[in-house]
Amino acid sequence: MSTLPIRTVFFISDGTGITAETLGHSLLAQFPEARIRQVRAPFIDDLDKAIDCANQIREAARNDGVRPIVFSTLVSPETVEALHKADALFLDLFDRFIGPLETELGQRSTHTVGRFHGIADSLDYKNRIEAINFAMAHDDGVSSDGELAEADVILVGVSRSGKTPTSLYLAMQFGVKAANYPLIPEDFERNKLPGELHNYRGKLFGLTIAPERLSQIRQERRPNSRYASLDNCKYEIDAAQKLMRRENIRWLDSTTKSIEEISATILQSVRLNRPGY
């Protein structure tokens, strides 16, 4: 059992905190033995909120007996200064990079609060909403031939192999219109793709998964059923992989991959150059 003290880690932002939390998690993942208690502090966009947050940091330091770690993407010098007065390891993610960028680009930063994630009126936001609606409307094979023409990518694989969450993540994070289609026993018996997919081979990407993991997931949904049995899962996975090889479909084993890794692989494979939001 670890004897390391518990450290409180704050993710502080004047916006949603997504950037601070994402980068913070990436860095902390390099220290698997660290004992961490996480505190999210979004929308710290004025001095009063910053002072309250600084007091929380001081309280955490007293309770833990060690100073907290702060990942910050605050822009306002006033709020940054207030937080610097607290006893913490303060990792200012914007300050670390804004200066070199100003020098390289030959211009001053706007230092505008909420600049990146404040996109409610932008085209990017509209595209994301449309992509989310598309993913929900074209889940689990609910698509007509004409509608599939609008898809940026069509995910295929056996039931519960991760198609739906991946489709939604691609939509929410990248504005990608992703449909998904289940491969079912009838497809394996015919040893061919569903007819409606034939015209869209270039958009197809397959997901597979270890049979043991698939059986575990299916048992949660339909315990003690043939659908969830390990033998059936082995059969379906083997048949799906053979079908994808025969049809020359690119595919990925999702068993040990995060949804972020799966999505990045799909974007690269189908050559969708989309910025993340």
From Swiss-Prot:
Substrates-to-products reaction catalysed: [pyruvate, water dikinase] + ADP = [pyruvate, water dikinase]-phosphate + AMP + H(+); [pyruvate, water dikinase]-phosphate + phosphate + H(+) = [pyruvate, water dikinase] + diphosphate
Annotated EC: 2.7.11.33, 2.7.4.28
Pfam families (alphabetical): Kinase-PPPase
UniProt superkingdom: Bacteria
Stretch forming the signal peptide: none
MF annotations from Gene Ontology: ADP binding; ATP binding; phosphotransferase activity, phosphate group as acceptor; protein serine/threonine kinase activity
Keyword set, alphabetical order: Kinase, Nucleotide-binding, Serine/threonine-protein kinase, Transferase
InterPro entries for the chain: Kinase-pyrophosphorylase, PSRP
Amino acids binding ADP: G157, V158, S159, R160, S161, G162, K163, T164
Enzyme class: transferase
HAMAP family: PSRP (MF_01062)
Family note: Belongs to the pyruvate, phosphate/water dikinase regulatory protein family. PSRP subfamily.
Function: Bifunctional serine/threonine kinase and phosphorylase involved in the regulation of the phosphoenolpyruvate synthase (PEPS) by catalyzing its phosphorylation/dephosphorylation.
NCBIfam families recorded: PRK05339.1
Name recorded for this polypeptide: Putative phosphoenolpyruvate synthase regulatory protein
Source organism of this protein record: Azoarcus sp. (strain BH72)
Lineage: Bacteria, Pseudomonadati, Pseudomonadota, Betaproteobacteria, Rhodocyclales
